Amino acid sequence: MNEKILLQAEKEFDIRFSEVDSMQIVWHGSYALYFEDAREEFGRKFHLEYMRMYEFGFYAPLVEFKVNYKQPLKYQDKAKIVITFRNTESAKLIFDYEIYNTKTNVLCATGHTVQVFLDTNYQLLWTLPPFIREWKKMNGLPE
């Protein structure tokens, strides 16, 4: 039986005044913060927090960020972001995102990010760090 294991987390949030532009729709730069909040929620849920990586001697900088806007979110809307880990053999963390308006359940944005691993000397890793191999194993993912 070869079931695909899906690691997902979600977080609900309110659209704040500081996140919108003069048209009162979410400013494009706010999506980077939403994605970051989702990664932190994922880290808490699946024990892959940034400080844990740091304690193992690694950094995971963002090298790719993409967002596709489908429908606008507006000031005072309530939204939900769903983050999904995309397993890869590469020494990367890849996440997909979906943002929904919780009142209408309309998909408002999708996106993805890619992070790589650096050691404490800021050298790029070409293979998975041992702690990520162990983390994948703990969560039933193939290396």
Segments the model singles out, each with a brief description of its role:
Residues 1-45:
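Catalytic strand-loop segment that frames the active site of acyl-thioester-processing enzymes
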Residues 2-11, 74-75, 85-143:
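HotDog/MaoC-like acyl-thioester-processing domains
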Residues 12-16, 68, 116:
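Generic structural detector for well-ordered beta-strands
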Residues 26, 60-62, 108:
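A broad, structural micro-motif
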Residues 17-19, 66-71, 103:
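Short, well-ordered turn and helix-capping elements at secondary-structure junctions
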Residues 42-93:
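Hydrophobic beta-strand-centered segment that forms part of the acyl-chain substrate-binding groove
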